[in-house]
Regions:
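Catalytic domains of carbohydrate-active enzymes, especially glycoside hydrolases
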Residues: 36-51
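Active-site-adjacent loop and "lid" segments of alpha/beta metabolic enzymes
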Residues: 3, 9, 24-36, 55-83, ...
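Phosphate/pyrophosphate-binding loops at sites that engage ATP/ADP/AMP, CoA/4′-phosphopantetheine
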Residues: 41-42, 82-83, 159-172
């Protein structure tokens, strides 16, 4: 489990989500990117994850230029106050973001692009490798697996092992099973239960306000999914997950504080 700097206690690190996209599924993430990010830092975020391309189911791709216009100014400002992750599938955008101050690449396509893989090696940055079946535009159209846990595990570990074989520090590698990215509800639940299969690498969960929670809780809109998101975070704490990506930083930090206090 990750260690929160300064207090000597262990809990999942909290990564606040900033979606600099006009079609983000969570309304409040796309307004006032810098101000919202700095509020997240004040609320206790350890990382800020900034993305300019929507990867929600059915999302359409955008140009590299448009993606950079959305994210680079925010990365430049926020990286002066907090560690920043760039959420992108494009190696050109990732390189510009690293130059602007980002220190992690969060690639939802799981380093499919060899140039992205090479950039991680050359820069020595932290990286989150996520599993996605298909592409955002079609990934939720009847996804199928023979054994979802084994298939996702093999896919992610092959890439992580290859990074390590090329000299990349293991402590800078996070693996994300990709909840909601080419998975049905049962697939998602199986992957969350089996997250230890991704060890010895650090594990990241990104479940905040996703449709999985809406399906379980009968909450069709994202606004009604905070309680379900916190339930997932409590399970992440119990399972010693290393980092979680969330829209609601303060609520998750408070949750972990209470869980720690109850253990004391």
């Amino acid at each position: 489990m990750a260690v929160l700097e300064g207090d000597g206690k262990t809990r999942p690190l909290v990564m606040g989500i900033i979606n600099a996209t006009p079609d983000s599924f969570h309304e409040s993430s796309r307004k006032g990117g810098v101000a919202r990010a700095l509020k997240m830092v004040d609320d206790g975020a350890n990382w800020i994850d900034i993305g300019g391309e929507s990867t929600r189911p059915g999302a359409k791709s955008i140009s590299i230029e448009e993606e950079m216009e959305r994210v680079i100014p925010i990365v430049t400002e926020v990286s002066q106050h907090c560690r920043v992750s760039i959420d992108t599938r494009n190696h050109i955008v990732a390189k510009k973001a690293l130059e602007a101050g980002a220190s992690m690449i969060n690639d939802v396509s799981g380093l499919r692009d060899q140039k992205m893989f090479d950039l991680v090696i050359e820069s020595g940055c932290s990286v989150c490798i996520m599993h996605m079946q298909g592409e955002p535009g079609n990934m939720q159209k009847n996804p199928k697996y023979t054994n979802v846990v084994e298939e996702v595990r093999e896919n992610l570990l092959e890439k992580a092992d290859r990074l390590v074989d090329n000299g990349h520090p293991i402590e800078k590698i996070y693996l994300d099973p990709g909840i909601g990215f080419g998975k049905l509800l049962q697939h998602n639940l199986e992957l969350l239960r089996a997250s230890d299969s991704l060890r010895p690498y650090s594990v990241m969960w990104g479940v905040s306000r996703k449709s999985m929670i809406g399906d379980i809780c009968n909450q069709p809109t994202t606004e009604g999914r905070l309680a379900g998101s916190l339930a997932v975070a409590a399970k992440a704490y119990e399972k010693k997950i290393d980092m979680i990506r969330v829209h609601d930083v303060r609520e998750h930090v408070d949750l972990f504080s209470v869980l720690e206090a109850m253990e004391d």
